[in-house]
């Protein structure tokens, strides 16, 4: 299992991860404070193939 988190607003990165086989597992709202504003974070994971 490989997991990652990415800012929800970073659509290009999310598409790239999806193309690499990652799937969205959840969203944490207002989790990261960046430039004075709270941002949503998407958690993604890729599981080993059996």
Predicted regions and their residues:
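Conserved catalytic-core motifs of GNAT/GCN5-like acyltransferases
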Residues: 3-6, 23-39, 43
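Conserved active-site alpha-helix within GNAT-family acetyltransferase domains
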Residues: 8-26
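Acetyl-CoA-dependent GNAT
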Residues: 47-50
């Amino acid at each position: 299992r490989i997991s990652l988190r990415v800012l929800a607003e970073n659509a290009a990165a999310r598409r790239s991860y999806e193309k690499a086989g990652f799937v969205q597992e959840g969203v944490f709202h207002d989790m990261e404070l960046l430039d004075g504003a709270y941002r949503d974070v998407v958690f993604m994971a890729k599981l080993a193939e059996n």
